[in-house]
Amino acid sequence: MTDHAAAITALRAQLSALDRTRPVGGRPPVATGVPAIDGALPAGGLVCGGIHEVLPGRHCGAGHGFVAALLGRLPESDGRILWCRAPGPANAALYAPGIAGFGLLPGRLLQVYPRSDEDALWVMEEALRCRRLAAAVGDGLLPTPTQCRRLQLAAEAGDTLGLMLLPPTARPPPSVAMTRWRVAAAPDDPASDGLGRPRWTVNLLRCRGGGAGNWDLEWDDEALRLDLAGPVAHRPVAAAE
């Protein structure tokens, strides 16, 4: 057996060992903790058993921070989190202190580095079906609408939160995910001394059964939560597709 095949077999065995049935009733949505945002989502948060896409700005740092902040809200009792990074020299190991700064304990992460996009999508599908994982993150992957539908079905089967951190691109494919967000870094608070809190401009571009909106957020690194950073432009639009 080749090293590659052995790695795939080992991962399958690890996911199988984790897989146990959760209590009947499913998991509640994952609230962002920001009432203005959660009020714009039909379920009051990100629905588990579904795919949610995050489209970063020119650089992925803001997207990574936003995703880590969301994952940090998952109870530890929900299980571990698989983080699958797309092949490529830029996708090195996640910076543990940076992740911990957003309330996500590095020890909860199972980091996977497939050799091809095909393998990465397979990993995501298997992980989303594993009912003992709290969430699965596809970092740098750009699935086609058909591939995204497969991931959605896998997430529904596992009742698992699926987050796709798309690569920076001017023309992402049409979304079939439950939500699609655009996250970009925002300027620091001019009143802050030195290095201010992380700030992001977050746009909800698509929400199945809901609307859209724009928010300026900042990360409170003492309370470990997201807060509104200033005046909010939140304009509901027609019901989403």
Where are each of the predicted segments found?
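Phosphate-binding/switch region of NTP-binding enzymes
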Residues: 167-223, 227-231, 238
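Generic beta-sheet signal
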Residues: 52, 84, 133-138, 162-167
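Detector for small/aliphatic-rich hydrophobic stretches
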Residues: 1-83, 92, 98-106, 206-210, ...
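Conserved beta-strand scaffold positions in the cores of enzyme catalytic domains, especially
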Residues: 51-53, 111, 180
